[in-house]
Design a protein with these regions (language model features):
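Secondary-structure edge/capping motif, primarily at the C-terminal ends of alpha-helices
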Residues: 73, 105, 109-112, 169, ...
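Hydrophobic alpha-helical connector segments
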Residues: 57, 71-100, 151, 155-158, ...
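Amphipathic alpha-helical segments used for helix-helix packing
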Residues: 96-116
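Hydrophobic/aromatic-rich alpha-helical bundle segments in the mid-to-C-terminal region
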Residues: 140-187, 196-209
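Amphipathic alpha-helical packing segments from all-alpha helical-bundle domains
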Residues: 64-67, 71, 115-142, 152-156, ...
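Helix-turn-helix
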Residues: 11, 19-53, 57
């Protein structure tokens, strides 16, 4: 008796994520996925009509997991600098546990082959930029930050440098500890935002007082 559809779909998604971390996106075919899952290729097509549909599910799963991890940090009642530090730590931590994330998010071939997949990535970036924009706006209004740049422009800077860090990690085959990049990113953001007396970087999440 076959496995329930939802369970099989999750196996396919999880296996695809593992394969992307190991081999990159370009080499992943439905047959490669089927071999990893241990099923016939026809079983993949039973649950996902095309390879792009598999990657669509993968992108939605990864982005959903990432936002689930960082959303409480964005919505915290802590000061803006503390919230930013916690978001950085959570983002880097999530990516460290899902090495395929940068290889999938930044795959030119994947995006050029499918406007749907490209649209999902654009939505992820827009949602993250919006969240950082609000955090920075809060920091400016509270006096924690003093940058004369608009919150929108500063949010784009934050998102872009985070993307660059993930890309560098992926290009170097995960040869350094991604979470060790947190303090330098945080210090850079604090300087760019002209933060006044920012909270020091800590070894763990800073809890709300």
């Amino acid at each position: 008796m076959g496995k329930p559809s939802e369970q099989r779909q999750q196996e396919i998604v999880t296996s695809t994520i593992e394969l992307c971390a190991e081999q990159g996106v370009n080499k992943i075919t439905t047959q490669v996925i089927a071999d990893r899952v241990g099923v016939a290729q026809a079983t993949i097509f039973k649950h996902f009509k095309t390879r792009d549909k598999v990657f669509e599910a993968v992108l939605r799963w990864l982005s959903g997991g990432m936002f689930k991890a960082v959303e409480p940090m964005f919505k915290s009642k802590a000061s803006a600098d503390v919230r930013l530090q916690n978001v950085i730590r959570k983002q880097l931590g999530f990516a460290s546990q899902h090495k395929a994330l940068p290889r999938i998010l930044f795959s030119d071939r994947l995006h050029s082959d499918s406007s749907v997949l490209k649209g999902i990535v654009q939505q992820v970036m827009a949602r993250m930029t919006e969240a950082f924009t609000q955090l920075i706006r809060d920091g400016l209004e509270s006096g924690t930050f003093a940058s004369k740049q608009s919150p929108e422009d500063m949010a784009k800077l934050v998102v872009s440098t985070m993307q660059g860090t993930l890309m560098r990690w992926s290009i170097h085959d995960y040869s350094f500890d991604l979470q060790d990049e947190g303090p330098a990113l945080y210090e850079y953001y604090m300087q760019a935002l002209l933060a006044s007396n920012p909270a020091a970087w800590t070894d763990g999440l800073i809890e709300d007082k």
